[in-house]
Amino acid sequence: MKKVILETERLVLREYVQEDFSGLKEIISDDETMKYYVKPYDDAGVQRWLDWNFDNYKKHGFGLFAIELRKTGEFVGDAGITLQPIDGEWLPEVGYHVNKNFWRRGIASEAARAARDWAFSNFEFDALYSYMTVENIPSQATARSLGMTKIKEYFDGEEILRCIK
């Protein structure tokens, strides 16, 4: 059974289920969608993504949630809160990934805004963060639409990431 976490005017955010594998694979194994990641995910990586979120739900009560279109129930991405290593510190991050067939429709912003509000209402976070490569202008725009501002850039391996609070 699918556990709905929150709803917006157009979207339903719910916990992932194993049956989301193919929809998730379409997103995170796509070269264009994942061009700001080290590499797209293979089948084993997609399963690890799901398992990581299943584990996050149990351990923390949050994670990335599947995004469905409210009208059709179609899976279009994920958004939510995860703990991420940002400049040497584990911090709560607002993350979002949307199927490229649904880009430029405000889905990432709407889902991330709902996740942000839900997190502040249900957990005692002082702040939420987003981080992305300096080149990832679309993700930066989504973070800014949530009211986030740049606080620093830092070097992490081979990428310079922008941290927005």
What are the roles of these predicted feature ranges?
Residues 1-35, 68-165:
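Acyl-donor (CoA/ACP) binding surface of acyl/acetyltransferases
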Residues 21, 43-44, 52-54, 79:
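Short linear motifs in intrinsically disordered/low-complexity regions
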Residues 32-52:
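Conserved GNAT-fold acetyl-CoA-binding loop/helix
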Residues 53-66:
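A short helix-loop-beta-strand connector motif used in the catalytic cores of GNAT acetyltransferases and
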